[in-house]
Regions:
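Predominantly extracytoplasmic/ectodomain segments of secreted and cell-surface proteins
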Residues: 1-38, 121-123
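Short, surface-exposed linear segments at secondary-structure transitions and domain or protein termini
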Residues: 72-77, 122-124
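Aromatic sugar-binding surface patches on proteins
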Residues: 76-87
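Surface-exposed, short loops/turns at beta-strand junctions within beta-sandwich domains
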Residues: 90-97
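Short, conserved beta-strand segments of beta-strand-rich sandwich/propeller modules, principally
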Residues: 98-102
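Beta-strand-rich extracellular modules
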Residues: 104-108
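C-terminal edge beta-strand
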Residues: 111-122
Length: 124
């Protein structure tokens, strides 16, 4: 499983299939330290390609799944509803360059949160 936060880019090669986990923040003890408000969790999510190199086809993205139990992402144990996962599949002739994925989640209080995830496709 690959782990990314919203502040970093992720490098992959052509023909790769990766399960990706995204930590949406910590919301413990009434302190807002991440993108989620204290006590809030993710209800649903969607992922799409928002930018890509000229002439490139979109990589294949699975549906977004909200974690229903504890999940470690980047060394932090995310409680249920604090992280999402999806599968990224790149084609054998995927165009090299930077892709920007747009993750959109809706929280249990009805708030919509959007995060851009940077994906660099290169030769490995």
């Amino acid at each position: 499983m690959s782990e990314i936060t919203c502040r970093q880019s992720y490098s992959v090669a052509r023909s790769e299939v990766r399960k990706v986990a995204v930590d949406l923040g910590e919301n413990t003890a009434g302190v807002e330290t991440g993108v989620l408000k204290a006590g809030d969790t993710v209800a649903s999510g969607a992922i799409a390609v928002s930018e890509k190199p000229t002439g490139a086809t979109d990589p294949t993205l699975s549906a977004v799944t909200v974690n229903s139990s504890g999940l470690y992402v980047g060394g932090r144990l995310c409680s249920a509803g604090e992280a999402v996962t999806f599968t990224l599949t790149l084609g054998a002739s995927q165009t090299y360059g930077r892709y920007v994925l747009l993750l959109t989640v809706v929280t249990t209080n009805g708030e919509t949160i959007k995060r851009r995830l940077l994906l660099d496709v290169g030769a490995e």
